[in-house]
Amino acid sequence: MYKIIEVKQSVFEDNNKDANKLREECKDKGVFLLNVMSSPGAGKTTTLSRTLEKLKDRMKIGIMEADIDSDVDAKTISEYGVRTIQLHTGGMCHLDADMTRQGLHEMGMEDLDLAVLENVGNLVCPAEFDTGSTKNVAILSVPEGDDKPLKYPLMFQVCDVVLINKMDVLPYLDFDVEKCKENILYRNPNAKIFEVCAKTGEGIDDWCNWLENEVKAWKE
């Protein structure tokens, strides 16, 4: 006599319960939790740096940097004078809701308006696990190609916002912006899309204005 357990299903069910509890906790405390995902090198940290330049004097922000190892990104972000914590995943390619909760509590969330999780660079695993975030953001860089939403559907289905980054290299690459937008909206008709260049600051104002309005609405 034996029992068959669908482990993957059980893991996701447990995580979803944890995620909903964390979302409720964030709502009760007025903390907007932003989950930022992308492939390695798409520009997450540079985009966050630009975002901090615009918003750090307008709201209280905390940043959680998730990596398999190293603290390179945390060092970069901490230079902006915001609360920063490094989360090492111990080889795991994503964060789940419980890891995120531990990071938030360790960092201290009581007085924050915005908590940002820079997830592990990966277009597959992070999309599978609900972190308890208020909103999910995917960053897609021009060098990756305009077909990424077709190849990695779940990432773009779970995201509320997509930032098309590195627009400065557009003239040098075979990348169709309108086709990319079409592919994103094919996967997620409700996705908000911003064209940005974290290096030059192009489009960052529009992105930050949207984010600031979302944070205010969440806290009401």
Model-derived segments and spans:
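Nucleotide-state-sensitive switch-loop elements of NTP-binding domains
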Residues: 2-37, 42, 46, 51-134, ...
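Short histidine/acidic/glycine/proline-rich micro-motifs that form metal-
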Residues: 12, 90-91, 168-170, 200
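Residues at alpha-helix caps and immediate loop-helix transition turns in enzyme cores, especially N-
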Residues: 47, 96, 148-151, 176, ...
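Active-site glycine-centered loops adjacent to acidic/histidine catalytic or metal-binding residues
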Residues: 67, 165, 197
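Residues at the C-termini of beta-strands that transition into short coil/loop
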Residues: 88, 140, 197
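Conserved C-terminal guanine-recognition region of P-loop GTPase G domains, centered on the G4
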Residues: 126-133, 142-190
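Canonical P-loop GTPase G-domain recognition
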Residues: 169-220
